[in-house]
């Protein structure tokens, strides 16, 4: 079995180059969304606690099965820990044998940003140049980098309640090639924004954006509302928007649309990417992607990592680990402890 550690991923991305790596993730994810009907899909299994949530996110096609373990603990940073950490496993369906264990903390941030970019391809105006981001925590830089893959951005305004988070974001974005504008309020941040990303972490019902703060024809990508009782946008804004989600069954439970019915949803994202339904239809309509994160996205990126693990030039970034016993007699599992003959551990 192979292992992709955080150090292995860092070295893999350095070898490929961040732009090329982001491009590969986008291409792979779009291709998997388009073959939506080939996947066995289910909403994530969430266990909620007063201080956070722990989730399992499975997805499979006819060849591979994946699942991700992921948490969400907004107060972790007060204790020097990440709010979100994740691990993933990819297995072959035919035997059920796991093939890869992968870090998924960084890959989750990357695939989440890739969804933002894919939605922007269909929902943002093609001439969008100014991006605004509300919330400059761990996800923010990935979001901007991915959107730059699909839109020719020129400027970026940003706001967070935490000045240190804005300092961190500004330092990381210094080499982005964008004109940066640090703002003192959400309203100020949205001035002249062609596209808006909301990426806040507080688990509560919010109403962050007023309709009259938005430029006509703006596109909003809301990713902070991702569990029951946690939303970022008010009813007036939702009802004025063309809404696209990843997976209706999950979004109606967890997303911004959790207090609306199914008729409020224009489409699932795969339907836009596959050309089944239109995305943006005018320069003035308000569009909204209500993104909560879906397991197909994890399948896509961990399968891409598995592909890299067998390619010359990249396989060295993956470790071989002995996690499964190989038996001379597969019915004699106990023999692993009692005999050294014909008994090995399988990497």
Predicted feature locations:
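Short helix-loop-beta connector
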Residues: 123-130, 152, 215-216
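N-terminal ligand-binding/catalytic initiation module
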Residues: 1-109, 117, 124-127, 296, ...
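Rossmann-fold NAD(P) dinucleotide-binding segment
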Residues: 203-219
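Glycine-rich Rossmann-fold phosphate-binding loop(s) that bind the pyrophosphate
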Residues: 136-137
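Short, well-ordered coil/turn residues at beta-beta hairpins
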Residues: 197-200, 222-223, 246, 302
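Rossmann-fold NAD(P)-binding glycine/threonine-rich loop
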Residues: 214, 222-278
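NAD(P)-binding Rossmann-fold cofactor-contacting core
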Residues: 150-173
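Short acidic low-complexity segments
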Residues: 178-193, 208-209
């Amino acid at each position: 079995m192979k292992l992709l550690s955080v150090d292995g991923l860092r070295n893999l991305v350095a070898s490929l180059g961040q732009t090329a790596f982001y491009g590969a993730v986008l291409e792979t994810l779009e291709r998997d969304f388009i073959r939506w009907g080939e996947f066995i899909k289910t909403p994530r299994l969430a266990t909620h606690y007063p201080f956070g949530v722990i989730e399992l996110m499975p997805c499979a096609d006819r060849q591979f099965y994946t699942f991700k373990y992921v948490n969400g603990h907004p107060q972790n940073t007060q204790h020097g820990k990440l709010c979100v950490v994740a691990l993933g496993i990819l297995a072959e369906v035919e035997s059920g044998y796991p093939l890869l264990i992968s870090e998924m903390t960084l890959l989750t941030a990357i695939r989440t940003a890739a969804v933002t970019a894919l939605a922007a391809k269909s929902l943002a105006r093609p001439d969008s140049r100014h991006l605004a981001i509300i919330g400059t925590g761990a996800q923010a830089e990935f979001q901007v980098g991915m959107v730059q893959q699909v839109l020719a951005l020129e400027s970026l305004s940003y706001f967070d309640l935490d000045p240190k988070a804005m300092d961190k974001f500004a330092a990381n974005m210094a080499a982005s090639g964008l004109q940066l504008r640090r703002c003192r309020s959400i309203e100020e941040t949205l001035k002249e924004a062609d596209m808006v990303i909301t990426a806040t972490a507080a688990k509560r019902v919010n109403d962050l954006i007023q309709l009259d703060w938005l430029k006509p024809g703006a596109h909003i990508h809301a990713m902070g509302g991702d569990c029951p009782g946690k939303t970022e946008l008010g009813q007036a804004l939702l009802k004025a928007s063309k809404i696209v989600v990843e997976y209706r069954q999950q979004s109606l439970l967890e997303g911004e649309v959790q207090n609306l019915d199914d008729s409020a949803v224009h489409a699932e994202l795969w339907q836009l990417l596959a050309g089944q339904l239109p995305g943006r239809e005018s320069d003035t309509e308000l569009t909204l992607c209500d993104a909560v994160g879906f397991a197909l996205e994890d399948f896509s990126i961990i399968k891409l990592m598995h592909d890299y693990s067998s390619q010359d030039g990249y396989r060295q970034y993956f470790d071989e680990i002995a996690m499964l016993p190989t038996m001379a007699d597969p019915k004699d599992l106990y023999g692993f402890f009692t005999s050294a003959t014909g008994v090995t551990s399988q990497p």
